[in-house]
Amino acid sequence: MGRSLKKGPFVDGHLMKKVEAQANDEKKKVIKTWSRRSTIFPSFIGYTIAVYDGRKHVPVYIQEDMVGHKLGEFAPTRTYKGHAADDKKTRR
């Protein structure tokens, strides 16, 4: 179930402050965050936000088509290495 429209999109306050401070600065730095639950706003476009995936910060460059999605969608938490291969020679 999605979020109610009357509430509006959610973004953590500390993340919004970092993005606004970055807008006033000439030099663009990577913004580190642990807030995977924050919605991407149009004001985030053009910034690189490093989203924590449980062991490291994954850099995510925000583009126009990402607006409205959550930051956590672009930093996968699980690594899938595939199933074990069947070694039929050892079974004989």
UniProtKB/Swiss-Prot annotation:
Gene3D superfamilies, per database record: 30s Ribosomal Protein S19, Chain A (3.30.860.10)
GO annotation terms (biological process): ribosomal small subunit assembly; translation
InterPro entries: Ribosomal_uS19, Ribosomal_uS19_bac-type, Ribosomal_uS19_CS, Ribosomal_uS19_SF
Molecular function terms from GO: rRNA binding; structural constituent of ribosome
GO cellular component: cytoplasm; small ribosomal subunit
SUPFAM superfamilies linked: Ribosomal protein S19 (SSF54570)
Keywords: Ribonucleoprotein, Ribosomal protein, RNA-binding, rRNA-binding
Annotated TM spans: none
One Pfam family it belongs to: Ribosomal_S19
Family, similarity comment: Belongs to the universal ribosomal protein uS19 family.
General function of this protein: Protein S19 forms a complex with S13 that binds strongly to the 16S ribosomal RNA.
Protein's recorded name: Small ribosomal subunit protein uS19
Species per Swiss-Prot/TrEMBL record: Streptococcus thermophilus (strain ATCC BAA-491 / LMD-9)
